[in-house]
Amino acid sequence: MPETSSLLPYTDTKPVGAADFYAAVNATFRFILHEQGLEGLRRYWLDLGRKYFAPVTRRWSEGGLQAVAEHWRAFFAAEPGAEVEVTHGAEEVVLEVRTCPAIAYLRAHGREIVPCFCQHCHFVSAAMGEGAGVEVRVQGGNGSCTQRFALAGHFVQPQQMEDIATAT
């Protein structure tokens, strides 16, 4: 993928993406889960983080937590309906997701949400951070959550899947 000046791994002429994409994402997760099981879906998320988001990983590696904060600000600015506060502290970047745009869209349009949907935030972000020495912990989900990013070794405990809510 060619390098761009964008903080995101893609370029778009629109300031905000199309929300109907969330239905396609949910359907993709459902299909992979049905065909390959939970471990197959988690492998997909890890591949997405490692491969598709590789340009972001490079920026994080070069720019540290400042680059992490910049990425998430740009990411959520392009997400329709997102209500997210990104704070960059001395040791952590914290995302307070008050309204997850994907969950809000899927609910508003009567879609059955894949129960493990919110786990993708952990697996994709963890894979993005691997090559940059950045770790993530996710707490909550099902429409709102807290995501904490820090340099590797900062968190004492590994991510607990039970800390990530089941989506409904």
Map each language-model feature to its residues.
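N-terminal accessory segment detector
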Residues: M1-V94, T99-Q119, A127, G131, ...
